């Protein structure tokens, strides 16, 4: 028992001397968090994680309710460091009695602190939730409607793995025949939240693919040939960044996405970049480009539809064309982190898709009759990202 007492003293001392968050290197942060998780697992009796499983969904639900009441907006707009219950109640929707219960919950989860009774001070997380990251909660709250029906879905289908993007748990839960992306177009708030999550994810993704791929060596082309086609490229973030990094490379850059996405592009694109409305399941209009590029597109589709997309690309590639797929890769180790496996379940319930391992990505490309030339590792924190280079 003396050793546990010493451990407790050591942890207390370490906490008292931790450097500020912005002075901790990401690699060291992840290593320490991993050790904290191991320590927690070693100390907890089985009933404690069971309790946590049983109540974990309430965090998202209560934050979503607080968003609806306007709690986070009130703190962002307030000039005061903290607000009393009375002050906060005057700035939000709903009854004060309910507000007090919501705030009591959020304080327990360290979203807010209570300097004194019925006075609330936002923790850093609360201020984040008043901005773009708060849309992540709105997005996940929509996904939770599917999760709530997941058991019923598998009871009905005999516990078969979903394999078709149009027969996913999403369609079952929302009683629709639409694909998730089609449904989003009819739900402005959900679409806005999804877009924010995608933008926020881009900010966290680490190095761009062209920082680790030998672009000058591999993608030299002629001026009368399209240099790169970014399929499913949204409003052009990747091709714009590529153009800034390689302003003198010859050949046009093309960003493709559904017409309504292309129409949402704000302002003119830089010279040398053109935008084309295109459904990637239909014949590819750009033939013989030097490179065809997809970033986090195919992970939204099960093999059935992913193979169709790859077939449309393969049939227009020239002998020296290159296919570049920039994707998350699921870890293959026995000790898998929680976030990647959770994302895998999200892909399953929304799209009938999956987070593929490197081996599964290679297998998919080979079944589509591509040769994998090399797998390039992209430097990121907390996730595995790879660039798959494939040829005919």
Please report, for each region that a protein language model flagged, where it lies by residue:
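Conserved adenosyl
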Residues: 8, 13-17, 93, 102, ...
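Short acidic-aromatic active-site loops that bind/stabilize oxyanions
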Residues: 61, 198-203, 350-354
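N-terminal accessory segments
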Residues: 1-181, 224, 369, 383-384, ...
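Residue-level "edge-of-site" marker
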Residues: 119, 353, 378
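C-terminal alpha-helical "lid/dimerization" subdomain adjacent to the S-adenosyl-L-methionine
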Residues: 328-368, 373
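NAD(P)H-dependent oxidoreductase Rossmann-fold/reductase module
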Residues: 288, 340-343, 392
């Amino acid at each position: 028992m003396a050793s546990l007492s010493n451990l407790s003293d050591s942890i207390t001392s370490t906490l008292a001397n931790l450097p500020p968050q912005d002075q901790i290197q990401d690699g060291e942060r992840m290593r320490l968090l991993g050790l904290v998780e191991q320590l927690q697992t070693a100390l907890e009796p089985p009933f404690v994680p069971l309790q946590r499983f049983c109540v974990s969904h309430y965090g998202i639900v209560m934050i979503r309710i607080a968003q609806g009441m306007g709690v986070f907006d009130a703190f962002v707009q307030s000039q005061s460091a903290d607000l009393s219950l009375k002050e906060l109640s005057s700035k939000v929707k709903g009854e004060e009695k309910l507000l007090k219960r919501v705030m009591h919950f959020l304080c327990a989860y360290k979203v807010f602190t209570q300097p004194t009774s019925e006075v609330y001070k936002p923790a850093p997380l609360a201020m984040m939730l008043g901005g773009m990251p708060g849309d992540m909660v709105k997005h996940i709250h929509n996904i939770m409607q599917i999760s709530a029906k997941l058991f019923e879905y598998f009871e009905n289908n005999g516990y078969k793995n979903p394999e078709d993007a149009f027969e996913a748990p999403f369609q079952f839960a929302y009683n629709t025949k639409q694909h998730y992306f089609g449904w989003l177009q009819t739900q402005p708030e959900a679409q806005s939240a999804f877009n924010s999550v995608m933008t926020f994810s881009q900010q966290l993704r680490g190095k761009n693919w062209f920082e680790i791929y030998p672009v000058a060596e591999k993608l030299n082309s002629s001026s009368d040939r399209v240099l790169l086609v970014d399929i499913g490229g949204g409003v052009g973030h990747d091709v714009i960044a590529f153009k800034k990094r390689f302003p003198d490379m010859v050949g046009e850059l093309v960003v493709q996405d559904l017409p309504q996405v292309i129409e949402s592009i704000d302002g003119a694109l830089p010279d040398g970049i053109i935008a084309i409305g295109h459904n990637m399941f239909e014949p590819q209009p750009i033939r013989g480009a030097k490179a065809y590029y997809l970033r986090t597109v195919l992970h939204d589709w099960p093999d059935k539809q992913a193979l169709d997309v790859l077939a449309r690309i393969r049939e227009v590639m020239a002998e020296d064309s290159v296919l570049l797929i920039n994707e998350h890769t699921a870890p293959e180790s026995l000790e898998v982190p929680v976030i990647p496996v959770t994302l895998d379940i999200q892909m399953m319930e929304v799209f009938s898709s999956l987070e593929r391992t490197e081996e599964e990505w290679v297998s998919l490309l080979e079944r589509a009759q591509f040769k994998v030339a090399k797998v390039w590792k992209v430097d990121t924190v907390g996730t595995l990202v790879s660039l798959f280079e494939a040829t005919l």
